[in-house]
A protein has these predicted regions:
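Substrate-recognition element of Asp-dependent hydrolases with the DxDx(T/V) motif
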Residues: 44-67
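Active-site neighborhood of HAD-like aspartate-dependent phosphohydrolases
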Residues: 1-48
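Short His-Asn-centered micro-motif
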Residues: 6, 54-57, 119-121
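Structural motif
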Residues: 3, 50, 115-117
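C-terminal cap/substrate-recognition subdomain and adjoining C-terminal extension
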Residues: 70-179
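Short catalytic/ligand-binding loop motif for oxyanion handling, primarily in non-cytosolic enzymes
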Residues: 13-15, 60-64, 125-129, 147
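Well-ordered, non-membrane alpha-helical segments in soluble/globular domains
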Residues: 30-40, 66-76, 100
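Acidic-and-aromatic substrate-binding clefts and catalytic sites of carbohydrate-active enzymes
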Residues: 30-31, 60-63, 94-97
């Protein structure tokens, strides 16, 4: 089984995002962008990978529920359905939970995983197991464009066994003025 460990903020949205997601009656988050959702769908279509949530939004999403009760869960469900995607699972809940530990625990419980990719704009939660995670990591940028076509191509390669960490150099140059 191939798996995409998915963060939302900085991957499926970015600082330039216009869409909004309901958090409560009075508070709205930056939403999930349709173009980035289509990019995610391309990865799934070309690799048949399953999506496992690592995002902090995971606490609002009920895995396997036909009807989401939480407004954020409803929003996420609708966005994923529009591009014919399903969320397979999520790592353990917790607001300040180290994502790297969550991914490692999830992988330990699922020995059937043959390949995986991590799509995230933050690497800090993965440093403790750098050797394990780095070859599977595709770094996106909140200040850049999120899940770009370059990131999509890198994720597909990693899921198809061509390991190698990827940081979008075009975004690095645009956002930070460096290469």
């Amino acid at each position: 089984m191939k798996v995409i460990f998915l963060d939302f903020d900085g991957v499926l949205n970015c600082v330039k995002s216009k869409s909004r997601a309901p958090f409560s009656q009075f508070i709205w988050y930056v939403g999930l962008d349709s173009d980035k959702m289509r990019n995610l769908a391309k990865i799934v279509q070309e690799t048949d990978a399953k999506i496992v949530l690592t995002t902090t939004w995971r606490d609002h999403y009920a895995i396997g529920a036909y009807k989401q009760e939480d407004p954020v869960g409803k929003y996420v469900n609708n966005k994923f359905r529009k591009v014919e995607l399903k969320i397979y699972d999520k790592i353990e809940p917790g607001k300040r939970f180290n994502r790297g530990i969550g991914v490692k625990r999830w992988l330990e419980k699922h020995p059937e995983v043959t390949d995986f990719v991590i799509l995230d704009d933050e690497e800090m939660g993965y440093y403790n197991d750098y050797d394990l995670f780095d070859p599977h990591f595709v770094k996106t940028f909140w200040d850049g464009h999120g899940l770009t076509e370059n990131c999509v191509n890198a994720a597909i390669k990693i899921l198809n066994g061509e390991l190698g960490a990827y940081r979008d150099m075009e975004d690095l140059q645009e956002v930070y003025g460096i290469i």
